[in-house]
């Protein structure tokens, strides 16, 4: 009986994965990464983005299945955690555990904060014009960290702006590396990752990032130890650079 049950479960899983494969084949592939593919299309009549964590041939199948499922669940929970706290993030439509697919709301007609900053700097050529955006970023990320949610990959490409852009309505995306932690060290590292990405992607914007940190400090109930840890992480980073 046990063998028959296992065979039936395996057949059901294979059938579910085949249905998912056929559905994805009808969508538009918009991004191919090392860990996942991102598709755009319609899901139950709604504009959707589907993130598919595809299996890696170099990993043991059982380990791969557990890792893919865990990361898919973590990302879905992170999005829900944000939304419950009033932080804008895509709506989760459906989680396909058989194929490790996450079906989410597409933020239509949005632009990345990265593209917005680059366009604004090309037009205005003055980082002062970014201060309001930087302050808004500080408020949003302070709220996220106050929920003990660590993004894990903070860049300006992982933040979207809804239109009208002047309202600075930021939507956080791509929580694939997220996790829950109340440790100031983890939050400090999160900010350090953003700082490195921000200043390397957007040269001559140091004043804007300073405005971001001031806003973060004023908006977060737990900012003091986090910003102290950020300074420590910076120092460690400089020491590693000097050592080579």
UniProtKB/Swiss-Prot annotation:
A Gene Ontology biological process term: tRNA processing
Compartments, record wording: Nucleus
Entry keywords, A to Z: ATP-binding, Hydrolase, Kinase, Nucleotide-binding, Nucleus, Phosphoprotein, Serine/threonine-protein kinase, Transferase, tRNA processing
Chain positions of motif Nuclear localization signal: 69-86
Cystine pairings recorded for this chain: none
EC number per UniProt: 3.6.-.-, 2.7.11.1
Modified residues (Phosphoserine): 25
Record: active site: 153 (proton acceptor)
Binding residues annotated for ATP, in chain numbering: 30-38, 51
Annotated GO MF terms: ATP binding; hydrolase activity; protein serine kinase activity; protein serine/threonine kinase activity
Catalytic activity: L-seryl-[protein] + ATP = O-phospho-L-seryl-[protein] + ADP + H(+); L-threonyl-[protein] + ATP = O-phospho-L-threonyl-[protein] + ADP + H(+)
Protein kinase domain ranges (all copies): 24-244
Transmembrane segments: none
GO cellular component, one term: cytoplasm
PROSITE patterns: PROTEIN_KINASE_DOM, PROTEIN_KINASE_TYR
Matching Pfam families: Kdo (PF06293)
Matching InterPro entries: Bud32 (IPR022495), Kinase-like_dom_sf (IPR011009), Prot_kinase_dom (IPR000719), Tyr_kinase_AS (IPR008266)
Family indicated by similarity: Belongs to the protein kinase superfamily. BUD32 family.
Entries under NCBIfam families matching the protein: arch_bud32 (TIGR03724)
Notes on the domains: This protein is considered an atypical serine/threonine kinase, because it lacks the conventional structural elements necessary for the substrate recognition as well as a lysine residue that in all other serine/threonine kinases participates in the catalytic event. TP53RK has protein kinase activity in vitro, but in the context of the EKC/KEOPS complex, the catalytic subunit OSGEP switches the activity of TP53RK from kinase into ATPase.
The protein's assembly and partners: Component of the EKC/KEOPS complex composed of at least GON7, TP53RK, TPRKB, OSGEP and LAGE3; the whole complex dimerizes.
Known function: Component of the EKC/KEOPS complex that is required for the formation of a threonylcarbamoyl group on adenosine at position 37 (t(6)A37) in tRNAs that read codons beginning with adenine. The complex is probably involved in the transfer of the threonylcarbamoyl moiety of threonylcarbamoyl-AMP (TC-AMP) to the N6 group of A37. TP53RK has ATPase activity in the context of the EKC/KEOPS complex and likely plays a supporting role to the catalytic subunit OSGEP. Atypical protein kinase that phosphorylates 'Ser-15' of p53/TP53 protein and may therefore participate in its activation.
The name this protein goes by in its record: EKC/KEOPS complex subunit Tp53rkb
Biological source species: Mus musculus (Mouse)
Gene name of the record: Tp53rkb
């Amino acid at each position: 009986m046990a063998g028959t049950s296992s065979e039936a479960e395996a057949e059901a899983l294979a059938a579910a994965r085949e249905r998912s494969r056929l559905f994805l084949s009808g969508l538009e592939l918009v991004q191919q990464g090392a860990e996942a593919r991102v598709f755009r299309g319609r899901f139950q009549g709604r504009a959707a983005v589907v993130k598919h964590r595809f299996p890696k041939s170099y990993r043991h199948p059982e380990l791969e299945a557990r890792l893919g499922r865990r990361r898919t669940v973590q990302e879905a929970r992170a999005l829900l955690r944000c939304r419950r706290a009033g932080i804008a993030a895509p709506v989760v439509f459906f989680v396909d555990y058989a194929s490790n697919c996450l079906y989410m709301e597409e933020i239509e007609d949005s632009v990345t904060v990265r593209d917005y900053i680059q366009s604004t700097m090309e037009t205005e050529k003055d980082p002062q014009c970014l201060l309001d955006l930087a302050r808004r970023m500080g408020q949003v990320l302070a709220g996220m960290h106050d929920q003990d949610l660590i993004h894990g990959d903070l860049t300006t490409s992982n933040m979207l702006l809804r239109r009208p852009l002047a309202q600075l309505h930021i939507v956080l995306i791509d929580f694939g590396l997220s996790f829950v932690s109340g440790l100031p060290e983890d939050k400090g590292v999160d900010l350090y990752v953003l700082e490195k990405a921000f200043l390397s992607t957007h040269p001559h914007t140091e004043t804007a990032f300073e405005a971001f940190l001031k806003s973060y400090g004023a908006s977060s109930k737990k900012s003091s130890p986090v910003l102290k840890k950020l300074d420590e992480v910076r120092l460690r980073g400089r020491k590693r650079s000097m050592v080579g």
